[in-house]
């Protein structure tokens, strides 16, 4: 059947535009010509769509909250290994769920899943090369020892030639990086770099050792480890990192920017935007639930992600986020810090329109949800007309 004829048949249905297009493409691809079959397909699709719609005035927020809260009580408090990568530890279970809904700026165990482009994804040596380019290398990684020379009152950095060769770093690179970060004189004796400060003292030298160890030489900052793992289903190599730095990783050759992601939702918002952050919230919560063997309809998670990102930035669900910013004074007071909210509202002369659920319950009024959203009254004209029809029927008989 032609596309235009199918469009005409679907024109007056309640199906959304994208669903109509998908249904048309399916019918055409399956080469269905029988009009009766097409009519039945459209009818069943419309019925299925109507069943998925939420009833008018349904409290979707409450349903979403209990649908996520109830499985949350069954979650474990422990931290598991990450999806078969024994070397990396990632927070899972209830602690991870709390991190997500609290919109923490930095997760307790930030990680990235780095996908590679086709040229690199199926070649192990190329994948390892990308991993080396990403992995952050500090002075500590290429030094055998870093200690204080008590005789000359200096810091001795004993370089490891093998580590430097593997990572393609020279002594000059190390000296240049140290000079950029610290104002001091450097003397080289073979594999030893002697760092001399202007006013040497034991206290001053001890204070500088941690800084020397953490000086960045190569790779992406904040990513101390990268592990290459082969995906058995796709046959491609995927990189798992400890630490997260999306914007810097995107600049490295061989990284697939479309699929690469992080578990740091606030970072995703800053780098990719609020829609990407919304998707990340859904995927992260869904991943936590699936790992625990808990099945929650994704639409509940979508409601939570929508409300967390509704005003263009990721906000937590709590007194410092959504609950603390409600328009209703009574709703804010009912959640936490009751006296503070009531004092503040009284001082500023705020009023409450009693438009939400909590505030109406507090004052003992019906809530504006479900049947509380509609008024019921008797249509007397209809009743009189009905009586008249019965009378007429009796006279005719």
Swiss-Prot record:
Catalytic activity of the protein: RNA(n) + a ribonucleoside 5'-triphosphate = RNA(n+1) + diphosphate
Function noted in UniProt: DNA-dependent RNA polymerase (RNAP) catalyzes the transcription of DNA into RNA using the four ribonucleoside triphosphates as substrates. Forms part of the jaw domain.
Protein's name according to its UniProt entry: DNA-directed RNA polymerase subunit Rpo1C
Keyword DNA-binding among record annotations: yes
SUPFAM superfamilies for this protein: beta and beta-prime subunits of DNA dependent RNA-polymerase
Gene3D superfamilies, sorted: 1.10.150.390
EC numbers, comma separated: 2.7.7.6
Main location: cytoplasm
TM ranges: none
GO molecular function: DNA binding; DNA-directed RNA polymerase activity
Organism of origin: Methanococcus aeolicus (strain ATCC BAA-1280 / DSM 17508 / OCM 812 / Nankai-3)
Subcellular localization(s) per the UniProt record: Cytoplasm
UniProt keyword list: Cytoplasm, DNA-binding, DNA-directed RNA polymerase, Nucleotidyltransferase, Transcription, Transferase
